[in-house]
């Protein structure tokens, strides 16, 4: 641009159109697939996951006790809270002692 006023020859438009962007993902989703996945996830939650729990005897002898359970994630967390707070396992010897009044 030369001067104070703009003239038409001073304006040069250079428009270049690139390739159009294809926004389609072309995924083939069926209505059954998500429902099927949800059912499988629900079955896993209902069936649970096998856990091995190792705890010490609450009767005082300190014996290690193993318990095998099948539980969901929420159930095993609740079980863990019970073991840490108010639930204690007993070995057979301590159970007999407590049952017989310590005799």
UniProtKB/Swiss-Prot annotation:
GO terms for cellular component: host cell cytoplasm; host cell nucleus. Residues 1-47 are annotated as: E7 terminal domain. A zinc finger (unnamed) spans 57-94. It is found in: Host cytoplasm; Host nucleus. The keyword DNA-binding applies. GO terms for molecular function: DNA binding; DNA-binding transcription factor activity; protein domain specific binding; zinc ion binding. The keyword Metal-binding applies. Keywords: Activator, DNA-binding, Early protein, G1/S host cell cycle checkpoint dysregulation by virus, Host cytoplasm, Host nucleus, Host-virus interaction, Inhibition of host innate immune response by virus, Inhibition of host interferon signaling pathway by virus, Interferon antiviral system evasion, Metal-binding, Modulation of host cell cycle by virus, Oncogene, Transcription, Transcription regulation, Viral immunoevasion, Zinc, Zinc-finger. A motif (Nuclear export signal) lies at residues 76-84. A motif (LXCXE motif) lies at residues 23-27. Disulfide bonds: none annotated. InterPro entries: Papilloma_E7. Homodimer. Homooligomer. Interacts with host RB1; this interaction induces dissociation of RB1-E2F1 complex thereby disrupting RB1 activity. Interacts with host EP300; this interaction represses EP300 transcriptional activity. Interacts with protein E2; this interaction inhibits E7 oncogenic activity. Interacts with host TMEM173/STING; this interaction impairs the ability of TMEM173/STING to sense cytosolic DNA and promote the production of type I interferon (IFN-alpha and IFN-beta). The E7 terminal domain is an intrinsically disordered domain, whose flexibility and conformational transitions confer target adaptability to the oncoprotein. It allows adaptation to a variety of protein targets and exposes the PEST degradation sequence that regulates its turnover in the cell. Belongs to the papillomaviridae E7 protein family. HAMAP family: PPV_E7 (MF_04004). Plays a role in viral genome replication by driving entry of quiescent cells into the cell cycle. Stimulation of progression from G1 to S phase allows the virus to efficiently use the cellular DNA replicating machinery to achieve viral genome replication. E7 protein has both transforming and trans-activating activities. Induces the disassembly of the E2F1 transcription factor from RB1, with subsequent transcriptional activation of E2F1-regulated S-phase genes. Interferes with host histone deacetylation mediated by HDAC1 and HDAC2, leading to transcription activation. This is Protein E7. It comes from Human papillomavirus type 49.
């Amino acid at each position: 641009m030369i001067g104070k006023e703009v003239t038409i020859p001073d304006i040069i438009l250079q428009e270049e159109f690139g390739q159009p962007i294809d926004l389609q993902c072309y995924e083939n989703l069926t209505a059954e697939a998500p429902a099927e996945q949800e059912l499988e996830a629900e079955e896993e939650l209902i069936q649970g996951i096998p856990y091995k729990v190792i705890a010490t005897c609450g009767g005082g002898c300190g014996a290690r006790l193993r318990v095998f359970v099948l539980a969901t994630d929420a159930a095993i967390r609740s079980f863990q809270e019970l073991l840490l707070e108010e639930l204690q396992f007993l070995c057979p010897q301590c159970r007999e002692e407590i049952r017989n009044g310590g005799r």
